[in-house]
């Protein structure tokens, strides 16, 4: 089984990734993946796309047909366009409703998988030390602070370890980003000199 130390660290990595990538981006990606699965929703999505293309084609045909010179043809196209547009709007309304409920489900699962899990671990393991410190290694007040609020004295509590993990992950991500940006600008500088 995964130790408490690594469990808390991985939960914070997941939280950081969700916050960095963006919840709406993840929701949209999962929605697109869900539409690839053969379900009734994916059939509706394919039908919606077909109707959308048909509406655009009918609109194009109507614009290319003179309403005065070829009124019968134009009126027939107009009726077909209106009927197809109604079908498209009905299916679109159903898909929007299903996407809204899908998004709520994804948000709930995401919260329970990240922040909810973090809160659960902090509550459930509040008296459990993440790891012990060597005795006499730190002054009493520092050892007390590291074991705050309920871990045994001389150990690191899950709350403190959770804060350390969150801070370390954020700091390391900023360092990696800065290094990558510095390399990108260093690589772009010689290319800019060559063009001048």
UniProtKB/Swiss-Prot annotation:
<feature type="transmembrane region" description="Helical">
    <location>
        <begin position="156"/>
        <end position="172"/>
    </location>
</feature>
<feature type="transmembrane region" description="Helical">
    <location>
        <begin position="111"/>
        <end position="131"/>
    </location>
</feature>
<comment type="subunit">
    <text>Interacts with get3.</text>
</comment>
<feature type="topological domain" description="Lumenal">
    <location>
        <begin position="1"/>
        <end position="4"/>
    </location>
</feature>
<feature type="topological domain" description="Cytoplasmic">
    <location>
        <begin position="25"/>
        <end position="110"/>
    </location>
</feature>
<keyword id="KW-0472">Membrane</keyword>
<keyword id="KW-0812">Transmembrane</keyword>
<feature type="topological domain" description="Lumenal">
    <location>
        <begin position="132"/>
        <end position="155"/>
    </location>
</feature>
<feature type="transmembrane region" description="Helical">
    <location>
        <begin position="5"/>
        <end position="24"/>
    </location>
</feature>
<dbReference type="InterPro" id="IPR029012">
    <property type="entry name" value="Helix_hairpin_bin_sf"/>
</dbReference>
<keyword id="KW-0813">Transport</keyword>
<dbReference type="InterPro" id="IPR028945">
    <property type="entry name" value="Get1"/>
</dbReference>
<dbReference type="GO" id="GO:0043529">
    <property type="term" value="C:GET complex"/>
</dbReference>
<dbReference type="Pfam" id="PF04420">
    <property type="entry name" value="CHD5"/>
</dbReference>
<feature type="coiled-coil region">
    <location>
        <begin position="42"/>
        <end position="99"/>
    </location>
</feature>
<feature type="topological domain" description="Cytoplasmic">
    <location>
        <begin position="173"/>
        <end position="196"/>
    </location>
</feature>
<keyword id="KW-0256">Endoplasmic reticulum</keyword>
<protein>
    <recommendedName>
        <fullName>Protein get1</fullName>
    </recommendedName>
</protein>
<keyword id="KW-1133">Transmembrane helix</keyword>
<comment type="function">
    <text>Required for the post-translational delivery of tail-anchored (TA) proteins to the endoplasmic reticulum. Acts as a membrane receptor for soluble get3, which recognizes and selectively binds the transmembrane domain of TA proteins in the cytosol.</text>
</comment>
<dbReference type="GO" id="GO:0071816">
    <property type="term" value="P:tail-anchored membrane protein insertion into ER membrane"/>
</dbReference>
<dbReference type="InterPro" id="IPR027538">
    <property type="entry name" value="Get1_fungi"/>
</dbReference>
<dbReference type="GO" id="GO:0005789">
    <property type="term" value="C:endoplasmic reticulum membrane"/>
</dbReference>
<keyword id="KW-0175">Coiled coil</keyword>
<dbReference type="GO" id="GO:0043495">
    <property type="term" value="F:protein-membrane adaptor activity"/>
</dbReference>
<comment type="similarity">
    <text>Belongs to the WRB/GET1 family.</text>
</comment>
């Amino acid at each position: 089984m995964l130790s408490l130390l690594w469990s808390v660290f991985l939960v914070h990595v997941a939280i950081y990734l969700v916050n960095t990538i963006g919840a709406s981006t993840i929701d949209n990606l999962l929605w697109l993946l869900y539409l690839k699965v053969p379900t009734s929703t994916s059939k509706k999505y394919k039908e919606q796309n077909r109707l959308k293309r048909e509406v655009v084609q009918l609109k194009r045909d109507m614009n290319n047909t003179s309403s005065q010179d070829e009124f019968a043809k134009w009126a027939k196209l107009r009726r077909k366009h209106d009927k197809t547009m109604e079908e498209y709007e009905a299916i679109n309304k159903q898909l929007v409703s299903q996407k809204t409920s899908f998004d709520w489900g994804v948000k709930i699962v995401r919260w329970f998988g990240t922040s909810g899990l973090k809160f659960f671990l902090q509550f459930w393991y509040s008296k459990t030390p993440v790891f012990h410190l060597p005795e006499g290694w730190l002054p009493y007040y520092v050892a007390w602070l590291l074991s705050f609020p309920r871990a045994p004295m001389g150990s690191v509590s899950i709350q403190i370890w959770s804060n350390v993990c969150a801070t370390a992950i954020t700091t390391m991500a900023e360092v990696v980003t800065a290094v990558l940006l510095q390399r990108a600008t260093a690589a772009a500088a010689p290319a800019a000199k060559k063009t001048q």
